Structure formats: structure tokens, C-alpha cells
């Protein structure tokens, strides 16, 4: 008779070692060296010693977790959020803001092989004007969870407060939770978004089943009592306006309207400074023709139009092109035009590009702009400002400009998301004469 044996699970004993941390990476992990190998340890800061357990051992590097911290860095801070360390939203509340900015700037400088000229920052707390909170009904307790995802998990952290949220939004958290937790449709809710616009506060509720008249009435009463613009989203395509007018925000003296689902920069303060610095770096003159690629609904395009002879905004999403045109009309700007184009194709052959451009600005998504770099080079602008939310693709795309005879004149780290691992940046390229 054949006999079958289950293979015994291999057990590994985690090695406990003592390390000294000498650096902080841009994601907020302490960096140490052990046996000639780089070791990444979340939760530790430079100048700290600790006993750590190795959790992952690769050929080039290893990861570890803290068993016992033996000393504290002078730049260690007490996290303001009670959910820090569990919630996946923030990774660096234990580090001083100055240390966070230095570590991100150093990472950017290494990637770009160029010194960081400046850090563009604003308030480090209460800066986030948009939040998307996951909702989950717990049948056992008949309670509604509302919060953000746990670090490295799809589980939800039931968030009671969030100090990086705009104060108006943080104050709403318990009230929104109580309202949604009283709905008959509590088990059919997907997420809720809160947005703080200049025009007021928005609440967008994603529900996966039709709402009863009683639930709709309850939501309307809540929105009126809290002064919210209320939107209901039964699916990803439909958005019903229950109350409120078209929202808008200020951008360098202009009023930009947007749909509740449109992308807007989360950090209003840094956005204002970023736009102002981009215009300054481009040195826009009254006779200039300026091209804005990946322009969205005109965050840079419209402020550029207040200084240049003419501005062309190019965007791949038709709805954003329409919104840009609408915003130009609302602000009385007649020297700006928006075009819907596939930026992977050669747009330099379009009629609007035949006269060339003196200056170019681009603000692509995380994938970068590899498909348009040669097109920009063909246009031969004097100055180029590249705004990036991914330093790796920025470094890759920059190579084409450097080979074409451009040099990096300025490099800024944008502290758009304090206390997180997100690193944004802006570069000025100048053509060598």
C-alpha cells in the first residue's frame, strides 16, 4: 500500500542583530549596513541604534523590523495621529519635517545627478483637501467601518481622526460616520469622498444598490445641516448632483471649476506656490507662445495665459479639455486654446504647432512622458519646466533632453505630501546656446 507523507514546513529562525541607522530613504525607512549589505528598517531614524529582526534577506539588500530601539534620534517626533503605524496613509510622522524634506531631496538629487535648488513646501499638517474613505459593513457587529487601508493590506483602519486632512474635513469624520451608519443601505456603500474646495465642502457617496427615499431624505438633511454639496454615485459613470453648484478653487488669482471626480492637486498651498514658481522659472514674456502638455483642466495653462501672448493646452482626456475651455471663458482669457490629442502621437505636425513655442511646460502622470520628449525637442523651446510625481520616470525622460543639448538649471523638491513616502518634483531645463 502506498503511503503519502506531507512535507514538513521549513521553519526559519529570524536573526536578531544590532544595527546603527545612518540614513533615511524617501519612503521613511531607516537605512543601515550589516555584513556589507544594505538593510531597510521601517520606523528607525538616522543616529538611532536598535535590535532588529531580519524579515527578508535578498542578495543585494535585506529588510528588518524593530525589536527594541536602543536610542532616539534628536529628530524623532511623537506622531500626532493615533492610527500611525497601522494606517497605510502616512509613513513618516515619527520624523521631523526637516528630516523628511532632507531625505526626499537627497533621493531626488541622487536620481537626477544634480543638486536640489529649493524645497517648495507649505503647512505640514491639515494640508489635504481631498480624502477617499473606504466603507465596509460588519455583519457580526452591524457596524459600518469608515477609514483608510492598513499598510500592506486591504483591511480598513477605522479612522477617528486624521491630522493631515484639512481641519474642516477632519471635523466632519465623526458626523459622516454617524450619518452613513444610520442608513438602511449601510451594507451597500462603497466609499465616501470629502473635498474641500474654495467654494465649499463636497461629499460624494458611492453606493452599490438604490437608496430608499428615507435614506435620500436623511442624506439631504445631513448635507443641508453641515452645508455640504452632496453627490451620489450609483456607479463609476453616473454622478447625481443632489445639492450644490459647480465647485471651484482658486489658482493664482483665477477661478477654476471642476467636476467632483476630476483630479485636482491635493495640497492647495503647495499647488499655489508650485504654479507661481513654474511661471517664474519659465520667465514668461508678453510676446511668448507657451505649450502646456498634459494640461488637465488648466491648473498651469490659465495662469500662463495671464502673462503670455498665447498658450496652447494639450490633454488626452476630452472631458478635461472641455473643462479647460469653460474655465478660460469664465476667467475672460481669450489667448488660450485647449486641444484633445493622443500625446503618444507626433503632435508637432498639428496646425496649432506650426509656429513653434518659446516655452514648454509638462505635468504628466506617474508613467512619465517618454512618448513626447522627442516632440518637445523638435519644437526647440528656450525653456522647459517638467513637473513630476515620479522621480524615476523624470530621471528617465530627462536623459533625452540632456542629450539634445539642454541643461538642468533648477531642481525643486515639492513637499506635496508631508509625512508620506510620495516624492514630487519640478525641473527647469534651459537650452544651451
Swiss-Prot record:
A Gene Ontology biological process in which this protein takes part is: rRNA base methylation
Highest taxon of the lineage: Bacteria
Q: Which reaction does it catalyse?
A: uridine(1939) in 23S rRNA + S-adenosyl-L-methionine = 5-methyluridine(1939) in 23S rRNA + S-adenosyl-L-homocysteine + H(+)
Pfam families, per database record: TRAM, tRNA_U5-meth_tr
Top enzyme class, one word, equals: transferase
EC assignment? 2.1.1.190
- In what residue span(s) does the TRAM domain sit? 10-68
Q: Which SUPFAM superfamilies match?
A: Nucleic acid-binding proteins (SSF50249), S-adenosyl-L-methionine-dependent methyltransferases (SSF53335)
UniProt cross-references to InterPro entries, sorted A to Z? 23S_rRNA_MeTrfase_RlmD, MeTrfase_TrmA_AS, MeTrfase_TrmA_CS, NA-bd_OB-fold, SAM-dependent_MTases_sf, TRAM_dom, U5_MeTrfase_fam
Report keywords, A-Z: 4Fe-4S, Iron, Iron-sulfur, Metal-binding, Methyltransferase, rRNA processing, S-adenosyl-L-methionine, Transferase
Q: Name one GO molecular function term.
A: iron ion binding
Residues binding [4Fe-4S] cluster: 81, 87, 90, 162
UniProt-annotated catalytic positions: 389 (nucleophile)
Kindly list the positions annotated as binding S-adenosyl-L-methionine. Answer: 265, 294, 299, 315, 342, 363
For this protein, the record's NCBIfam families field holds: PRK13168.1, rumA
Protein role: Catalyzes the formation of 5-methyl-uridine at position 1939 (m5U1939) in 23S rRNA.
Family per similarity comment? Belongs to the class I-like SAM-binding methyltransferase superfamily. RNA M5U methyltransferase family. RlmD subfamily.
Protein name (database record): 23S rRNA (uracil(1939)-C(5))-methyltransferase RlmD
Q: Which species is this UniProt entry from?
A: Shigella flexneri
Which gene carries the instructions for this protein? rlmD
